[in-house]
UniProtKB/Swiss-Prot annotation:
Residue ranges with Polar residues bias: 242-254
Source species: Cochliobolus lunatus (Filamentous fungus)
Region (Disordered): 242-261
Stated name of the protein: Zaragozic acid A biosynthesis cluster protein 8
Pathway: Secondary metabolite biosynthesis
Biological role stated in the UniProt entry: Part of the gene cluster that mediates the biosynthesis of squalestatin S1 (SQS1, also known as zaragozic acid A), a heavily oxidized fungal polyketide that offers potent cholesterol lowering activity by targeting squalene synthase (SS). SQS1 is composed of a 2,8-dioxobicyclic[3.2.1]octane-3,4,5-tricarboxyclic acid core that is connected to two lipophilic polyketide arms.
């Protein structure tokens, strides 16, 4: 009855204050119960196969370690004093229902400016799981992601080749065409000059092969005539086959033969 009369009418105020300002050790979305359950599950994953008594001892040790850790951290935070602090304000000195009577300036009332005292840029608390007592129609369901099933293609399909018609020159801009022609002329002029110079060098160095061959043959014949020159007065050669020799030795041999006979 007390909760229904005193707390539920101001549920939005104290719930938002609880979510915004109470420390949760940097865990803003996951609740403390979910965090503790996660740690217990990790412990049971490694110690769950042992005896139940040892499991309870291990969980008791884990809880004591967390309690000492939180106690030491709160003590260190209470001892940390900002440099610009006038005096230290403890959490126990602040009324739990301070938002019901927000601080006012002296002599002024801000009855119509209550929105100024609400926290600026509040954090968005994301709910986890399904709310208790909710039905399918009352809960907004996000659309499911469509699953795409890709089938393996086994048949080879012939694709039609699409040939685009060439764009006519008349459709181009005249200024663009002139600019293109100027750039092309500037690039082609030095290349044409280099090609002409190379062609002149080739023409000057190349000799006709047929003319060169004739000249070589004529020079060879001339050299042959110079080495084997013909005499100016040619004497007739008489054949002496079947005739008597008129040399002195031959005449003497014939005379000796006659004397012996």
């Amino acid at each position: 009855m007390y909760l229904e009369k005193e707390q539920l009418p101001y549920f939005n105020e104290w719930a938002e204050c609880f979510c915004q300002y109470l420390p949760d050790f940097s865990i803003r979305v996951t609740s403390r119960a979910e965090g503790s359950h996660h740690k217990i599950k990790i412990r049971l994953h490694f110690k769950g196969q042992s005896h139940f008594f040892h499991v309870v001892q291990d969980l008791n040790q884990m809880v004591n370690e967390q309690r000492h850790k939180h106690k030491n951290k709160s003590a260190a935070n209470s001892a940390r004093v900002p440099a610009n602090a006038v005096y230290i304000v403890k959490l126990s000195q602040i009324d739990q229902h301070w938002f019901l009577q927000p601080p006012r300036a002296k002599g002024l009332l801000f009855e119509q400016d209550d929105d100024l005292f609400w926290p600026l840029d509040p954090r968005v608390i994301k709910l986890k799981g399904r709310p208790r007592g909710a039905t399918t129609k009352s809960v907004l369901r996000t659309p499911k992601r469509r699953r795409v099933i890709r089938k393996k293609v086994t048949d080879i399909t012939e694709e039609e080749e699409v040939v685009e018609a060439p764009q006519s020159s008349g459709s181009l801009n005249a200024a663009t065409m002139r600019l293109f022609q100027q750039v092309l002329h500037q690039e082609m002029t030095p290349m044409q000059a280099q090609v002409q110079a190379l062609q002149d060098r080739i023409d000057s160095s190349v000799v006709n092969i047929s003319d060169n061959k004739k000249k070589v043959e004529e020079e060879g014949l001339r050299s042959f005539d110079d080495e084997f020159f013909s005499p100016k007065h040619v004497q007739a050669v008489q054949l002496s086959y079947g005739t008597r020799s008129h040399t002195p030795a031959a005449t003497q041999r014939r005379g000796q033969g006659r004397g012996c006979g």
